[in-house]
């Protein structure tokens, strides 16, 4: 996760970054940490409902400049890499770690199952292409198909998905001037965009399904500050063809950090930036995990008064927590939610996902 340790040898996320697609769907080795996050809700032909999460992480160990020096390139001749270039050197050297999470929420059986992977990045076990989307980790993969759609596959235990995702909107870039601020100071930010309305069709556990998904792609070299405990992130897809992304960085005293922000994505794909003072998030209940002992908010009232948005989010299951001892070693809650409320005084319904970190221990303390 982006809260993990930062190395100043990697590039900081700075204002002025110009996104370019499909280039920026690919990997960015010059930044230390990067993730591709897929979440969605699906309905099978027989009415069975599912939530899913598939996430690919890349954590840099050796920055590209050091790899190129090791390959014999003189420091005076090391121009910046383009987004579609990879550094020279032996591809089997340990440059990056590749981690992945896969989770299924089975609403009918009230069951939540998750799986994790950790590998060194190498040509045949786990890698991330530059310049276009193609990331994989031991058989789990997100890749661009010839017609421009994405294919997402993962299988573990008794669970398997094989999904086709087609975007109905352009990428939504979050933040301002190319950066999403997470902490005070130079480089305390990430480059962050989302694909907020992905039409999905495919197979989940042998059942043909359809639905909506959301993809986040974020890259940077920062970590949470010592006084920051974690974050609460919300993705909301409404039936009026608008979407809402909010994140609240939590301080250790439980109050929202001033770097918290969000975005409203309109029906035509325009992105409206939301500052911390425009958002309201009110927890409605609490749930204590029997696995980690962490106590999480459970149910939320989310509002943006300036846009006349007021919605209530309810989890499809309380138990949607991942305790990832074999990969990222971060305990977090990532779960499917239902959404109902009003937008500009008109009733709306929808779906979403919520992510909560730092409730078992502050992430800002991780080094």
Spans of model-derived segments:
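Structured soluble/peripheral alpha/beta segments that form catalytic or ligand/cofactor-binding pockets
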Residues: 1-367
């Amino acid at each position: 996760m982006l809260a993990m340790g930062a190395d100043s040898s990697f590039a900081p996320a700075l204002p002025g970054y110009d996104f370019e697609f499909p280039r920026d769907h690919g990997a960015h080795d010059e930044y230390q940490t990067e993730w591709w996050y897929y979440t969605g809700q699906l309905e099978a032909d027989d009415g069975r409902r599912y939530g899913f999460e598939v996430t690919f992480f890349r954590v840099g160990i050796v920055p590209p400049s050091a790899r190129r020096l090791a390959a014999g390139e003189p420091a005076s001749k090391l121009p910046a890499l383009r987004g579609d270039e990879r550094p020279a050197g032996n591809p089997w050297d340990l440059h990056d770690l590749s981690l992945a999470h896969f989770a299924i929420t089975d609403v009918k059986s009230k069951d939540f199952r998750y799986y994790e992977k950790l590998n060194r990045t190498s040509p045949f076990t786990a890698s991330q292409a530059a310049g276009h989307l193609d990331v994989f980790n031991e058989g789990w993969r997100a890749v661009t198909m010839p017609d421009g759609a994405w294919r997402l596959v993962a299988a573990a235990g008794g669970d398997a998905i094989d999904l086709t995702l087609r975007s109905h909107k352009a990428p939504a870039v979050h933040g301002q001037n190319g950066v999403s601020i997470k902490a005070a100071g130079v480089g305390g930010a990430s480059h962050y965009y989302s694909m907020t309305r992905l039409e999905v069709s495919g197979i989940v556990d042998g059942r043909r399904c359809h639905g909506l998904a959301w993809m986040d792609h974020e890259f940077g070299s920062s970590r949470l500050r010592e006084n920051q405990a974690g974050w609460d992130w919300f993705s909301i897809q409404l039936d009026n063809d608008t979407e809402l992304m909010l994140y609240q960085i939590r301080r250790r005293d439980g109050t929202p950090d001033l770097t918290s922000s969000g975005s409203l994505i309109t029906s035509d794909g325009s992105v409206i930036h939301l500052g911390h003072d425009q958002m309201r998030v009110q927890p409605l209940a609490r749930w204590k995990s029997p696995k980690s002992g962490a106590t999480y908010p459970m149910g939320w009232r989310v509002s943006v008064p300036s846009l006349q948005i007021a919605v209530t989010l309810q989890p499809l299951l309380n138990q949607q927590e991942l305790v990832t001892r074999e990969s990222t070693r971060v305990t977090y809650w990532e779960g499917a939610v239902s959404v109902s409320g009003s937008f500009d005084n008109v009733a709306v319904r929808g779906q979403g996902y919520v992510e909560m970190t730092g409730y078992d221990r502050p992430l800002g303390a991780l080094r």
